[in-house]
A protein has these predicted regions:
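Short, structured segments at the rim of ligand-binding sites
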Residues: 1-417
Length: 417
């Protein structure tokens, strides 16, 4: 049985180099379907989801080659097969973002309904409505979405919610549309700004990415380019939270503090010390943390991906904290696993009430998704006795070297097959 074993550990000390952002790399890889030629992508994390996206691109007709560590060479020969099969899409929800670029480039796309992490429904209606406003038409049957269009036409699109995936899909489609597209109430995440930077390198005209209004002037043709993916703020948050739980002092090399302002502010309220420099972030925790209340919100608010780490921190903090999930339903499932470890947590609808305890207790637990699995790993740093995290393959979807990095910082952690 594949499992991660964590035994009682002391404070963490040392350096961790932050990898490229999963949520940026996957979308940039999908955008390679927009133009012929050979793309060179750097700072790409070596994780399961990237390998799955590589398989998907190959199934479309591209070639993907690993050049050096964290570097991909993607060649698009043109005349791609505009179908993303169920066998690949079911494993990764992010696969849906090939829909927009395939429609824009080839006038058709057939994409299986997506799978991925299991934490409640995340409808793709906003993706489809936005693309329809650009001129696409869709039919859904037998578990597939079939789309077709003539050349897409620019339009003003107001999103009912700042959906990251919908913003990305519409943005990638609009770069080859005829005319101007304006996306209002757009998602503002750093990964969207990174995707826009990549598209602009290709010859697109995207203005305002990272703000709530994005303006795209369609162009006739794009070209292949080089690009380095931005650092992963979610990975950085994982190690930051690990220090909050176990204590210690580490440097997060390459982390972008400007992408993590709200998180840094919140953990500062809890008692952590954080400072930024040109190399990244320095984080320290040398005393018990104080409980706070927090709520997930679209960027620049507290990301829903941060929440499992913050819940794990609150589980061993002094006092009572209330966490409210405003973005996704069903994303408290990992709390049952923390309760198995001795956490005092009560859930009420979209709220979790967490009463901190001094230490957790080692127990066998299961990783339900990427971030929940990582949260269980770092929570185990503060557990008495051995903790066994089962189904760590979920963690592999988003982390390149979580076990190795924590071990290098002083954690007593290993992986067994």
């Amino acid at each position: 049985m594949d499992r991660i074993i964590v035994k009682p550990s002391g404070p963490l000390y040392g350096d961790v180099e932050i990898n490229g952002a999963k949520n940026s790399a996957l979308k940039i890889m999908a955008a390679c379907s927009l133009a012929e030629g050979t793309f060179h992508l750097m700072n790409v994390p070596d994780i399961t989801d990237v390998r799955l996206m590589s398989e998907l691109l190959v199934s479309l007709g591209m070639t993907v080659r690993e050049n050096d560590t964290n570097s991909l060479e993607i060649t698009n020969p043109g005349n791609l097969t505009a179908e993303a099969p169920y066998e690949l899409v079911e494993k990764m929800r992010a696969s849906i973002v090939v829909l927009g670029p395939l429609l824009a480039r080839y006038g058709k796309a057939r994409v299986a309904l997506p799978g991925g992490d299991d934490f409640g429904p995340r409808p793709i209606d906003m993706h489809l409505r936005g693309l329809e406003m650009l001129g696409a038409k869709f039919a859904s049957e037998h578990g597939y979405i079939d789309g077709h269009c003539e050349r897409l036409r620019g339009s003003r699109i107001v999103l009912e919610f700042p959906s990251v995936g919908a913003t990305e899909n519409i943005m990638m489609a609009a770069v080859l549309a005829d005319g101007t597209t304006i996306i209002e109430n757009a998602a503002r995440e750093p990964e969207i700004a990174d995707l826009a930077s990549f598209l602009n390198r290709m010859g697109a005209s995207v203005l305002g990415a990272g703000t709530s209004t994005i303006v795209i002037e369609g162009v006739e043709k794009l070209g292949a380019v080089e690009h380095a993916v931005v650092p992963d703020r979610i990975e950085a948050a994982t190690y930051l939270a690990a220090v909050g739980i176990a204590g210690g002092e580490i440097n997060l090399i390459g982390a972008r503090p400007d992408h993590m302002d709200m998180l840094c502010q919140k953990v500062g309220e809890m008692g952590m010390r954080i400072s930024a420099d040109s190399n990244g972030l320095w984080v320290m925790a040398n005393k018990s943390l104080k409980a706070v209340d927090l709520a997930t919100l679209p960027y620049p608010g507290i990301a829903t991906d941060y929440k499992p780490f913050l819940v794990a921190m609150l589980a061993v903090s002094e006092g009572v904290g209330i966490v409210t999930e405003n973005l996704f339903s069903g994303r408290f499932r990992y709390i049952d696993e923390l309760i198995r470890m001795g956490a005092d947590i009560r859930t009420e609808g979209h709220h979790a009430v967490i009463r901190g305890v001094e230490n957790l207790s080692g127990a066998p637990v299961r990783a339900h998704d990427i971030r929940a699995g990582a949260a269980l790993v770092i929570a185990a740093l503060r557990a008495q006795g051995q903790t066994e995290i089962r189904e760590p393959s979920h963690i592999d979807r988003g982390y390149e070297n979580l076990v190795e990095n924590l071990s290098s910082l002083g954690a007593d952690i290993s992986r067994e097959n």
